[in-house]
Amino acid sequence: MEFSVKSGSPEKQRSACIVVGVFEPRRLSPIAEQLDKISDGYISALLRRGELEGKPGQTLLLHHVPNVLSERILLIGCGKERELDERQYKQVIQKTINTLNDTGSMEAVCFLTELHVKGRNNYWKVRQAVETAKETLYSFDQLKTNKSEPRRPLRKMVFNVPTRRELTSGERAIQHGLAIAAGIKAAKDLGNMPPNICNAAYLASQARQLADSYSKNVITRVIGEQQMKELGMHSYLAVGQGSQNESLMSVIEYKGNASEDARPIVLVGKGLTFDSGGISIKPSEGMDEMKYDMCGAAAVYGVMRMVAELQLPVNVIGVLAGCENMPGGRAYRPGDVLTTMSGQTVEVLNTDAEGRLVLCDVLTYVERFEPEAVIDVATLTGACVIALGHHITGLMANHNPLAHELIAASEQSGDRAWRLPLGDEYQEQLESNFADMANIGGRPGGAITAGCFLSRFTRKYNWAHLDIAGTAWRSGKAKGATGRPVALLAQFLLNRAGFNGEE
């Protein structure tokens, strides 16, 4: 699908369709008023007859409006004008894309980007429109033999901006939006792949392909079990012992800043390509969704793709911690004591708390990069789902400025996160009689004690932890990976690179 920006009046558009907004109660947006004036009150007459109230999600498709060059005008209900916020704006864009696609409009000029969204500029509105459009049209049908496609799918979308001065920021918004959307799609595709295809070797192959596609700035190294053993990553290795698939750690290095003192930002993604729970096996109901336990790695992969596509002037390292947690004769057990790469020992009380056992060794491994900051992304705890539900990602950090940066990026991108505490009193729940710590701390504050566990391996750098257990995928009829938190991390890195979205 092709996107572009232009600045022009609606009466001069020869597009197949013009999209304009209508507010409650039957109030035309400024652009719709212009079209109404040109058409000698044709549109307002329809509204007076009760054809459209302007409620969110309502649509009315008009054909051959008098004195208008475009074949059709699509009126979209936007709710009450003063209540048009970020969430409602994206819902309006989503409804627009679906309606255009369903009605066979192959191209359209959209004036919704001229609507006032409180606290948001034209760059934000255009970029969010691009990201929302790509999200709306996403489907995962690679494994289906009968692929359903619209007869006349939407192919071209033009977003209008008020003045020519805003064309440059609009074009940049499209560039950024397309790169972020491509990263989200890549993460979703990986997450939706079945575990018999997407194992650690598959993740490694995708990481290598990324380096091949962006060979100027990207290098990928894959570390196998033998090298992990030599490095002392016994905790990581223990988790994968029960699986016939080899554990593989893929390290993707992007260099966008050649300065010697430019330290990298490291992103670590939990990549459990299937989590049965191991010996502490999960209930069978919903176990198929444990293919999504690698969504942290998928998100990191998507972010690395975005960074490489935009050639951001920052150094970023992405680590995909690929592994599979299966029961078997060689599987690790409750009661085992593992020696981590850091030298600290861990008593295993539950083999289904495996993500932290993989991550702790990776968090030690990345010390060698002398990072500016480390952010791990993991579907880590069901407790985070209980705490925050499926709308907001859990955030913990040992460095307040880093946490504030991530929260700000989450608000900018609409990919929201909420900070949880890492108090010393929670650390006491991890005490063990037989090792330096246990791998679980009981039910109270489970998301926080998991973060506390990881914090013991991050004392040498600034670190943040994103628990995406509630936000990485949807269940039910709309089951599928969401691609979160690619947008959040993309915004964080854009901000670091100086592209903060200000016009």
From Swiss-Prot:
Keywords attached to this entry: Aminopeptidase, Cytoplasm, Hydrolase, Manganese, Metal-binding, Protease
SUPFAM superfamilies: Macro domain-like, Zn-dependent exopeptidases
Annotated EC: 3.4.11.1, 3.4.11.10
One protein family per Pfam: Peptidase_M17_N
Transmembrane segments annotated in the record for this chain: none
Domain of life, per lineage: Bacteria
Active site, renumbered: 282, 356
Binding site for Mn(2+) 2: 270, 275, 293, 354
Enzyme class, first EC level, given as a word: hydrolase
Gene3D superfamilies named in the record: Leucine Aminopeptidase, subunit E, domain 1, Zn peptidases
Function: Presumably involved in the processing and regular turnover of intracellular proteins. Catalyzes the removal of unsubstituted N-terminal amino acids from various peptides.
Protein name: Probable cytosol aminopeptidase
Biological source species: Shigella dysenteriae serotype 1 (strain Sd197)
Name of the coding gene: pepA
